[in-house]
């Protein structure tokens, strides 16, 4: 009985909010709060916190390339309104998107399996 696993959205501000609640949730409720990046070791792939930048653009290129229209992106970085992170034209690629997706899934599956074993032992 009781809550054993809570899954939440893990992007940007929500990840930070989960991290801020971590200690209190563990003390008050015995609940472990883990983010998608709790288990990540590769620093280059660990913090994927951009908005329409190279990270998100690369993921879309890997999954739905027909949605990408670089004609809408200005080369001048000072005019990239609404973009945070690496430059979407110069730093994005389908290969990087696939690398991000594969690493994320591998890391999450491994981490969740490890945590699930701990939960079962409680």
Each model region followed by its residue ranges:
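Extended, histidine- and acidic-residue-enriched regions that form the cofactor-binding/catalytic faces
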Residues: 1-122
């Amino acid at each position: 009985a009781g809550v054993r696993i809570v899954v939440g959205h893990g992007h940007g501000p929500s990840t930070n909010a989960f991290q801020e609640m971590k200690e209190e949730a563990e003390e008050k409720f015995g609940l472990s709060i883990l983010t998608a990046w709790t288990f990540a070791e590769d620093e280059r792939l660990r913090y994927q916190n951009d908005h329409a930048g190279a990270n998100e653009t690369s993921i879309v290129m890997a999954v739905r390339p027909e949605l990408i229209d670089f004609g809408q992106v200005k080369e001048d970085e000072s005019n990239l309104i609404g973009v945070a992170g690496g430059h979407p034209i110069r730093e994005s690629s389908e290969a990087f998107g696939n690398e991000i997706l594969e690493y994320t899934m591998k890391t999450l599956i491994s981490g969740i399996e490890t945590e699930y074993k701990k939960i079962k032992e409680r």
